[in-house]
Amino acid sequence: MDIGIDPGLSRAVAVLGIDGVLLALHDVPILTLSTSRGSRTEYDVPGLVALLAPYRGTQTHVIIEESQAMPGQGVRSMWITGYGYGIWVGVLAALQMPYTTVRPAIWKRALGLGKDKEAARLRAMQLYPQADLRRKKDHGRAEALLLGYYGWQRLGCPMTAGERR
């Protein structure tokens, strides 16, 4: 089984069977919190654990996109990106789920994609026509699916708990 994780707040988790068939596609669980300035969203960490826990102990290979700072990105934005990535890695470690990190340029190049999110969505729709990717904003779902597909196609065999590539 391969699980693809696009780790942003408005992203997704895709679960593929050992044959590469889509088993589940989940939006990242988030909480909306009230603040003195309005509201903000953050990761629902217990929700992340509940989402991944059923796959613990199975022959599972998790592929997570490696988050990195981008040129011109603000300090707060960089912090949020790293914080979210760290939460995901912490959840995977706590659940003892083996994982591989991959930079966006690596997996996208391997699948013949560029930086365009719409191209990723269209490619995912070709590979998985049953997936609900109709909206342009479903690029996070599409990228999670493609990360899982990349793992299934390129990295092959599952790993054992505690192993990391």
Task: Name each model-derived stretch.
Residues 1-165:
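Phosphate- and other anionic-substrate recognition elements at nucleic-acid/protein interfaces
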